[in-house]
């Protein structure tokens, strides 16, 4: 038995990033792991060196497909170093929250 994992990330479109996704079919019991995509088609890389890594950070049931299918929220990383991709806004936000987590925040996050 298989299920579908819909990997979701934000691309490099400016001035406002767009949501991208691609589907991976996994065997029952397999966890969604690190995957990749061609960043030249998402404004995240040049065509000659276009690999970008998708790293899952959160999964939830897929409300659109139902069943055992899931949505996989991802961050993007550079394949050579596994450092956050320049378009990875979640990594930048996490760094700020890690640094100032003991403070009271007076702002909201939107997606």
What role is predicted for each listed range?
Residues 1-111:
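ATP/Mg2+-dependent ligation/transfer catalytic cores
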């Amino acid at each position: 038995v298989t299920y579908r994992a819909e990997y979701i990330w934000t691309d490099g479109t400016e001035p406002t990033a767009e949501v991208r996704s691609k589907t991976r079919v996994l065997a029952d019991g397999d966890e969604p792991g690190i995957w990749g995509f061609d960043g030249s088609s998402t404004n995240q890389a040049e065509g000659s060196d276009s690999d970008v890594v998708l790293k899952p950070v959160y999964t939830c049931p897929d409300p659109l497909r139902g069943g055992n299918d899931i949505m996989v929220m991802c961050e993007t990383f550079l394949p050579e170093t596994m450092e956050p991709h320049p378009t990875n806004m979640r990594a930048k936000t996490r760094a700020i929250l890690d640094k100032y987590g003991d403070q009271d925040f007076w702002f909201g996050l939107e997606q």
